[in-house]
Amino acid sequence: MRRTNEVRIVGTAQYYETGGTWQVAGVSCNAFKPDDPNNLVLISEGNKPGYQEVTATDFLEKKVTFEKEDGTLYAKDFADLAMDTSISMKNLYVKRIYTTESDKDTSNGAMTLTCEVDGKTVTVRTNVLFDEDGKKVTQDAFLNKTIDVEGVVGLFNGDYQIKVVALDGITVH
């Protein structure tokens, strides 16, 4: 099971327009001043990651409405606001799988799973996955099966997807 560390980060939140993401800039860790309140600090280790459970409808269709300073309203996709955050989704039926095949690419063996849940199509992208014996996991492990996933919201070719980075991020029913 994956484990994570809890840290305190001090910096400035800024939007990275080229990458289309928010980031924290100005993070520092001064080893000569370990008590500096601006340091990056390890708080705890070995924590189970937190995943916000999301429905397919919310992931694909939900809009979040904001009010601007002038009182006008505008809406953003829930998935856009959830970019690069960890979510989980349950009961996805795997209908198709595309496996990356390229000897020149580190993603050789990574898979794109086209899933259906509640009448909606959700895309799950994996890293190259390995089982406990170090063998590469193939599409046979997931095709025509129902799965639960834990991953990170991403965007590929204008479509939101759930990126799964390790085998324990997928549970087969």
What would you call each of these model-derived segments?
Residues M1-H173:
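OB-fold nucleic-acid-binding modules
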